[in-house]
């Protein structure tokens, strides 16, 4: 939709004398399921307080208007080339990420709870990383099994004893948060190269244009400052005489998140570089430019540890910079996030994060973990094998929804093959219950219907403060009955409106 063709239901004050109900009006095809927390409706079918204005407006919309709205926001994504890459059996294909035109809403109080929990969690994880690459007291005290940490593929012995600037190992974090009837919980920590923030910003831009009146009327907190805040965070990690030169290190245009790398570099005014664009002389990192070499002070890397430096890590890497880690150890360049942070987002280490919060902060976790069974233990393996049909089983180092088994949606043959993998290498897997993920309103297949969602907020930790964008990448399982929200597995995204006030969580 253009600015001159807004839908008739985009009104700041829709008539609330007849608010929408599940199963009627525009929600005629909306079916509630008591197993799942519904973000829009209460159990009796009435609108939640936070959804009353938007839900009332949607209830009065005709399908043609909603289809036009959906087409407009999708066309914007196509026009701007907002893509991701899906890895298939034979090849990789670039696709436009699907966007849903109905925003998800959270109250100020709900967001405050998430915000406080994420700050607490990232503080503890940074302290944990400093400890395991330092004196290792948490390992000696048995908070986390030493063999789990030291044997993790993401643990980098090269980082031992290295003084990380301001003790900030993780400056950029994307934490996946889910909601059930029991409240909010953390599903996964993404500490290495978290992605998706460009989709968050793109969703917001599309929805502000498509529903400007409803957007203004909801008094939504803004997220547009993220690139500016990211630059400030990166710049704060070192001591500079003037403004530091920041570069975004990308694997290149064939990477699944290349759109995001280019977007963030452009928004920050940073250099977008590949490994071949950088060179190290006398322990200093320079970018090759048409006017000669230019020193780089901070590297926001979107390249995995293994490929950062062929001298220190994988010798066959063509993506990294020879000598980069030497320059980093010498303190001549900042790398964010620091190498070796992946050990703290390993899915087996995840199970111990509540204990790490208690150990390092002497606080109870604000955000709960999901119950997790470690197949590396005899009890965890036995439980997982006995209940395979009812569990989600994940590789401890996996991501993107690849390499996992969703028990209720699997065949007997798939479970048999997965059980063989578990018995062969139990240390590579964890299992969790199938979560009753909350459902939010989406426009799919020509109707307003509920779909399962999660959200990935983005947390920035600088020298003196922590900043969290008041929103996040809200991911949607667009397939009816599906629980996997990853874009690589058929998921999409939608805007998340965090309200400044109003709306009881009920």
Where are the predicted features?
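Preference for protein termini
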Residues: 1-506
């Amino acid at each position: 939709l253009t600015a001159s063709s807004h839908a008739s239901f985009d009104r700041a004050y829709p008539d609330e004398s007849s608010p929408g109900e599940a199963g009627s009006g525009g929600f005629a095809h909306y079916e509630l399921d008591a197993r799942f927390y519904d973000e829009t409706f209460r159990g009796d079918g009435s609108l939640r307080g936070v959804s009353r204005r938007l839900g009332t407006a949607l209830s009065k919309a005709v399908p043609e208007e909603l289809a036009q709205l959906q087409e407009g926001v999708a066309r914007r994504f196509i026009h701007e080339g907002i893509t991701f890459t899906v890895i298939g059996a034979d090849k990789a294909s670039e696709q436009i990420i699907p966007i849903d035109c109905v925003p998800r809403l959270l109250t100020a109080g709900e967001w405050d709870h998430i915000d406080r929990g994420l700050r607490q969690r990232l503080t503890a994880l940074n302290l944990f990383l400093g400890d395991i690459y330092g004196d290792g007291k948490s390992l000696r005290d048995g908070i986390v099994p030493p063999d789990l940490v030291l044997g993790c593929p993401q643990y980098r012995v090269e980082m031992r004893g290295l003084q990380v600037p301001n003790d900030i190992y993780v400056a950029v974090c994307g934490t996946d948060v889910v909601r059930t009837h029991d409240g909010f919980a953390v599903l996964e920590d993404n500490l290495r190269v978290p992605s998706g923030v460009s989709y968050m910003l793109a969703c917001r831009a599309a929805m502000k244009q498509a529903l400007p009146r409803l957007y203004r009327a909801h008094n939504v907190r803004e997220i547009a400052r993220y690139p500016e805040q990211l630059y400030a965070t990166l710049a704060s990690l070192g001591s500079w005489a003037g403004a530091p030169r920041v570069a975004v290190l990308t694997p290149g245009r064939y990477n699944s998140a290349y759109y995001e790398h280019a977007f963030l570099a452009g928004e920050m005014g940073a250099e977008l570089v590949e490994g071949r664009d950088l060179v190290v002389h006398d322990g200093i990192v320079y970018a090759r430019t048409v006017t000669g070499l230019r020193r780089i002070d901070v590297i926001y890397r979107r390249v995995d540890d293994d490929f950062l430096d062929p001298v220190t890590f994988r010798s066959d890497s063509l993506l990294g910079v020879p000598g980069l880690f030497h320059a980093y150890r010498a303190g001549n360049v900042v790398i964010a996030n620091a190498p070796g942070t992946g050990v703290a987002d390993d899915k087996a280490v995840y199970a111990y994060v509540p204990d790490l919060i208690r150990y390092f902060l002497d606080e109870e976790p604000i955000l709960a973990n999901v119950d997790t069974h470690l197949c590396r233990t005899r009890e965890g393996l036995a439980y997982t094998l006995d209940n395979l049909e009812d569990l989600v089983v994940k590789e401890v180092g996996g991501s993107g929804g690849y390499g996992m088994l969703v028990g209720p949606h699997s065949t007997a043959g798939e479970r048999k093959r997965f059980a063989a993998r578990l018995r062969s290498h139990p240390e590579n897997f964890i299992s969790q219950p199938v979560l009753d993920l909350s459902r939010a309103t989406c426009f799919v297949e020509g109707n307003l219907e509920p779909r399962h969602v999660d959200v990935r907020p983005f947390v920035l930790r600088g020298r003196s403060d922590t900043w969290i964008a008041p929103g996040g990448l809200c991911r949607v399982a667009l397939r009816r009955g599906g629980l996997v929200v990853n874009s690589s597995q058929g998921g999409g995204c939608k805007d998340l409106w965090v309200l400044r006030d109003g709306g009881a969580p009920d």
